[in-house]
Swiss-Prot record:
Residues 1-13, 54-64, 103-116, 217-231 have a biased composition (Basic and acidic residues). Identified in the spliceosome C complex. Found in the Intron Large (IL) complex, a post-mRNA release spliceosomal complex containing the excised intron, U2, U5 and U6 snRNPs, and splicing factors. Interacts with TUFT1. Interacts with DHX15; indicative for a recruitment of DHX15 to the IL complex. Interacts with GCFC2. Keywords: Biomineralization, Cytoplasm, mRNA processing, mRNA splicing, Nucleus, Phosphoprotein, Spliceosome. Residues 149-195 form the G-patch domain. Involved in pre-mRNA splicing, specifically in spliceosome disassembly during late-stage splicing events. Intron turnover seems to proceed through reactions in two lariat-intron associated complexes termed Intron Large (IL) and Intron Small (IS). In cooperation with DHX15 seems to mediate the transition of the U2, U5 and U6 snRNP-containing IL complex to the snRNP-free IS complex leading to efficient debranching and turnover of excised introns. May play a role in the differentiation of ameloblasts and odontoblasts or in the forming of the enamel extracellular matrix. This is Tuftelin-interacting protein 11.
């Protein structure tokens, strides 16, 4: 092994002053690499073995390898070794760049002959196209080889649109002149002889790189292949924080502001150093120096890698570093605090400006309110002054109304917020009492309606008071009606006679849309109804010449269901009066007929069955059927009640008291050789006495068909020696005619029902929105032309009451309840419609 490294100085260089002296002392390199198994070793070359210390070596360009031979360069051309003398090893070895260079190499330091070595070729190979490589030939003869051909290439190009002197392509975007080549001066590498750009390149691409940019690019590319094992010093990188970054960050890493209160008195043991340290608060840890103890390596410093030189510890001043860092942190904190304070002041300015605007608006509003209130106060004081008895120009009700209208129009907010009740009590009530002082409601029912309507718009609150929830202290108009208008009504009702109902009804009809609902209910329930009830108790249908319906029925539009308690005593008195009645007396029908639409269908039918039907049955039982001399008075008395009693009751009377005797007379007549023409006239005459509704009843129809069958059997039998000519044909024709009429009537009824069903089906299909039970009842009422509307202010167990025709109902969970005599009875929808008709 060669000892050439011993002749170097501490940095590995030879001493130029002492070329003949050999130094054998231990250098720093020996100490650093004493225990380094990966230290660099020097391998002796052939030249060193031959010439020893006088050999010219360049150990930096050689690298140790495990093989005895150098790897072949397969990129070189094939070289045939001749049998003669072999060239020296120095010519075959290729130089490599050293990785251990410390100083960058500039391009000007290279020798002139620096470049790639000449390609070694044998004697059988010659370089080709030297003239083309050198660029000595001119391009003027480009394409001259076509002189010796037929010019097929040029012709094909012209057929495809090529124009001589222009470029190729659809838009002639191709190059016109061929790319020029420039011959390199020597055999060096690319760039060894400066720029190699041609004149054509300079014309097409005029941008020229400067020498500084080229030098910088060269040094950058060269430094990529360098390796600094000793860790050469790099240029330190500094990080700068701008004021904007500090503002954006808005905080500092350490809270080093003014001394703060201790977070907590907690004992903290720090064992991160060589010795154990005890702190008595968390804030004391932040004041600890961030410098390691003497003799201990920094945690960030790792032990030196094998084969690398250990770096000596840097120069450290922990106190100075701490003070500098403290100054930096304090400066950052001051900047951030100043920015926050500035932002706070700006926000405060904006807030104060908004507050100033709001306060200005509030001030203007308050000034307007004060001005308006001053004007309102002046007007009220003027009214009070004119209300004094000693005033020469007293205030009238019309002038007071104009003042209130002015307050409502021009000073609406103040008028709405003011206590109108006290204002009206003090000003309006005395004038209103004076206005109604001489009023008689029964003589002049419309007196004061316009005045009260005018004051209603001035005094009544926006929210209407519901029935039962009136509050006199909240609405000035309601209090005005109750305290001023109502005493006159009470006084006149106490003097009113219920049988003279028209003036009182007209009076209430005139005021019903003006006075509040609860006041109207109070009048009807507390004043009118007791008078009517007392008068009904004193009524006697046998002695009173005035019918009761003449002074009770006018109250139906106003009172409606309120009159229900009166109906039971009225029916009781009528029943007592009908005990000795005979159907020949038509006055009973005149008395009962007005009540048919007033009483409920059930109560009316029960009254008829109890008091009228037995009398009619007795009358029919006394009827004598005589074809030769018929007295029809009793029959007319019964048939006259057809509209009063139900069809089923009338048919029952006929089946029991009329048809048995009538059929018996027919059979007796047919058994005595009758005149069939007279029988036919007698049959048709009795049938014409009944209405179509009675004839359409199945029982009545069966009885008349039975009579036809008896007549047909009589003419078909051979009983008797003599038969009237044409009698059989006449009876057959009569039977056929009657049966056809029945069939046509039934067909017409079926067609009418089918049309009704079709209309209902179309209506159901047209309405795609599902209905509730109330909507269904409303639809049925429209189909049957029945009035269906709610009763204002009336409820039963919290359910709204409705009028369905002449009956009162309410709806509860899909069930209709009808008002009976004593209780509410559930009923079906069809029964409800039948009762309403």
């Amino acid at each position: 092994m060669s000892l050439s490294h011993l002749y170097r100085d501490g940095e590995g260089h030879m001493d130029d002053d002492d070329d003949e002296r050999e130094n054998f002392e231990i250098t720093d390199w020996d100490l650093q690499n004493e225990f380094n198994p990966n230290r660099q070793r020097h391998w002796q070359t052939k030249e060193e073995a031959t010439y020893g210390v006088w050999a010219e070596r360049d150990s930096d360009e050689e690298r140790p390898s495990f093989g005895g031979k150098r790897a072949r360069d397969y990129s070189a051309p094939v070289n045939f070794i001749s049998a003669g003398l072999k060239k020296g090893a120095a010519e075959e070895a290729e130089l490599e760049d050293s990785e251990d260079e410390e100083k960058p190499v500039k391009q000007d330091d290279f020798p002139k002959d620096f470049g790639p070595k000449k390609l070694k070729t044998g004697g059988n190979f010659k370089p080709s196209q030297k003239g083309f490589a050198g660029g000595t030939k001119s391009f003027m003869d480009f394409g001259s080889w076509e002189r010796h051909t037929k010019g097929i290439g040029q012709k094909l190009l012209q057929k495809m649109g090529y124009v001589p002197g222009r470029g190729l392509g659809k838009n002639a975007q191709g190059i016109i002149n061929p790319i020029e080549a420039k011959q390199r001066k020597g055999k060096g590498a690319v760039g060894a002889y400066g720029s190699e750009r041609t004149t054509q390149s300079l014309q097409d691409f005029p941008v020229v790189d400067s020498e500084e940019e080229a030098e910088e690019e060269f040094q950058k590319e060269l430094s990529q292949w360098r390796k600094d094992p000793s860790g050469s010093k790099k240029k330190p990188k500094y990080s700068y924080k701008t004021v904007e970054e500090l503002k954006a960050k808005g905080r500092i890493s350490k809270k080093l502001a003014a001394p703060q209160k201790e977070l907590s008195q907690v004992k903290v043991i720090d064992m991160t150093g060589r010795e154990q340290k005890v702190y008595y608060s968390y804030s004391q840890i932040s004041h600890k120096h961030n410098v390691p103890d003497d003799g201990l390596p920094l945690p960030s410093q790792q032990p030196p890698q094998p084969g690398k030189e250990a770096k000596a510890p840097g120069f450290a001043l922990p106190e100075l570093e701490h003070n500098l860092q403290l100054l930096i942190d304090l400066t950052e904190q001051e900047i951030i605090q100043s920015d926050r304070q500035l932002q706070y002041e700006r926000d405060m300015v904006v807030n104060l400006s908004h507050e100033l605007e709001k306060m200005s608006e509030v001030l203007e509003h308050e000034e307007r309110v004060i001005a308006n209130l001053s004007k309102v106060l002046e007007m009220v004081e003027e009214c009070e002054r004119r209300l004094q008895p000693s005033c020469s120009n007293p205030l009238t009700l019309d002038e007071c109304a104009r003042i209130f209208e002015t307050l409502q129009d021009k000073y609406y907010e103040e008028y709405r917020m003011s206590d109108r009740v006290d204002l009206a009590v003090a000003i309006v009530y005395p004038l209103m009492k004076e206005y109604f002082k001489e009023w008689d409601p029964l003589k002049d029912c419309a007196y004061g309606t316009q005045v009260i309507s005018r004051w209603k718009t001035l005094l009544e609150n926006d929210q209407l008071l519901s029935h039962g929830g009136q509050d006199l202290s909240a609405d000035a108009f309601h209090r005005l009606i109750w305290e001023v208008w109502m005493p006159f009504v009470r006084n006149i009702v106490t003097q009113w006679q219920p049988r003279n109902c028209d003036p009182m009804v007209d009076f209430l009809d005139s005021w019903v849309h003006i006075i509040p609902v609860w006041i109207l209910d109070n009048i009807l329930d507390q004043l009118i109804f007791p008078k009517l009830q007392k008068e009904v108790e004193n009524w006697n249908p046998l002695t009173d010449t005035v019918p009761i319906h003449s002074w009770v029925h006018p109250w139906l539009p106003l009172m409606q269901a309120r009159l229900e308690p009166l109906y039971s005593p009225i029916r009781s008195k009528l029943s007592s009066a009908l005990q000795k009645w005979h159907p020949s007396d038509s006055s009973a029908k005149l008395i009962l007929q007005p009540w048919k639409d007033v009483f409920t269908p059930g109560s009316w039918e029960a009254f008829m069955v109890k008091n009228i039907v037995p009398k009619l049955g007795m009358c029919l039982g006394e009827l004598v059927i005589n074809p030769h001399q018929q007295h029809m008075d009793a029959f007319y008395w019964v048939i006259d009640w057809e509209g009063m009693i139900s069809v089923s009751s009338l048919v029952g009377l006929l089946e029991k008291h009329f048809f048995p005797k009538w059929l018996q007379v027919l059979c007796s007549w047919l058994s005595n050789s009758p005149n069939y023409e007279e029988i036919t006239k007698w049959y048709l005459g009795w049938k014409s006495m009944f209405s179509d509704q009675v004839l359409a009843h199945p029982s009545v129809k069966d009885k008349f068909n039975e009579a036809l069958d008896i007549m047909n059997r009589a003419v078909s039998s051979n009983v008797g020696a003599y038969m009237q000519p044409g009698a059989r044909e006449n009876i057959a024709y009569l039977t056929h005619t009657e049966r056809r009429k029945d069939f046509q009537y039934e067909a017409m009824q079926e067609r009418r029902e089918a049309e009704n069903m079709a209309q209902r089906g179309i209506g159901v299909a047209a309405s795609s929105v599902p209905m509730n039970f109330k909507d269904l009842i409303e639809t049925k009422a429209e189909e049957h032309n029945i009035v269906f509307m709610p009763v204002i202010g009336k409820r039963h167990e919290g359910k709204q009451l409705y009028t369905f025709g002449r009956i009162v109902i309410y709806i509860d969970r899909g069930v209709v309840f009808v008002q009976g005599e004593k209780t509410w009875v559930p009923t079906s929808l069809q029964s409800l419609i039948d009762m309403a008709k």
